[in-house]
Design a protein with these regions (language model features):
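Charged helix-capping and loop-helix junction motifs
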Residues: 60-67, 110, 141-150, 175-184
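Glycine-rich, proline-tolerant flexible connector loops at the mouths of alpha/beta enzymes
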Residues: 46-64, 104, 165-175
Length: 241
């Protein structure tokens, strides 16, 4: 199972938010490429990057920083946040991004999701962000009436690469993942699942890994930046190193 470090970008800097609240940020670094380099040197094979401004505004806002990450590291980079058009998809993949995460657009514009999956099969991931079982959209600033489980069923035939499941209530809180919800997603999903939100210790990673081989990885952010979780130790514990 992959342990995937997260780089969340806001106003050109690496930050972390509490439960997706744009006003509750902690700035970790102004040197975004250096952060990416640090994770590559630590053993990461995939880095998860989120354009937080883009997620709210609906279009890329930190593209220069993401380009700088691509130029700096040789490992795979997946990007989410503000990807609402096929032109944006082509722009990112053309710049060297490996995979893209679609969230709001998967719910709001199914024809766009279809087109992206047809043009770039398995390079499009579903960002399934949920609070109390309902899908959140627009950078988590709005809650839809759609159940996360229903959306999974609807998208079963799409050429998605994976599903990233985030429990918003757990994100940035270091309280452990929502294993019950995650288990339901793993059982329902036709695609590999990546867990996100709340992971703070090796035991959390082992619990996620125990959900079976369909769990591709776990995204970790705050715990790494706050020093609560040592990245190399996490890799070693999961036998990933």
């Amino acid at each position: 199972m992959l342990v995937i470090p997260a780089i969340d970008l806001k106003d050109g800097r690496c930050v972390r938010l509490r439960q997706g609240d744009m006003a509750a940020e902690t700035v970790y670094s102004d040197d975004v490429p250096a952060v990416a380099r640090q994770w590559q040197q630590g053993g990461a094979t995939l880095i998860h990057v989120v354009d937080l401004n883009g997620a709210v505004d609906g279009e890329p806002r930190n593209f220069p920083q993401i380009e700088a990450i691509i130029r700096t590291v040789t490992v795979k980079v997946q990007v989410g946040g503000g990807i609402r058009s096929i032109e944006t998809v082509r722009r990112y993949l053309g710049a060297g991004v490996t995979r893209l995460v679609l969230g709001t657009s998967a719910l709001a514009d199914r024809s766009f999701l279809e087109k992206a999956c047809l043009e770039f099969p398995r390079q499009i991931l579903l960002g399934l962000d949920a609070r109390d079982g309902k899908v959140a959209v627009k950078g988590w600033t709005a809650l839809s009436e759609t159940k996360a489980t229903d959306l999974l069923k609807e998208l079963a035939g799409y050429a998605l690469g994976a599903v990233i499941y985030t429990d918003i209530a757990r994100d940035g809180m270091l309280g452990g993942p929502n294993l019950a919800a995650l288990r339901e997603v793993v059982e329902l999903s036709s695609f590999p699942v990546i867990a996100s939100g709340g992971i703070s210790q090796v035991e959390d990673l082992r619990a996620v890994q125990s959900l079976g081989p369909r769990v591709e990885g776990a995204i970790v952010g705050k715990a790494l930046y706050d020093g609560k979780l040592d990245y190399r130790a996490a890799l070693a514990a999961l036998g990933a190193e």
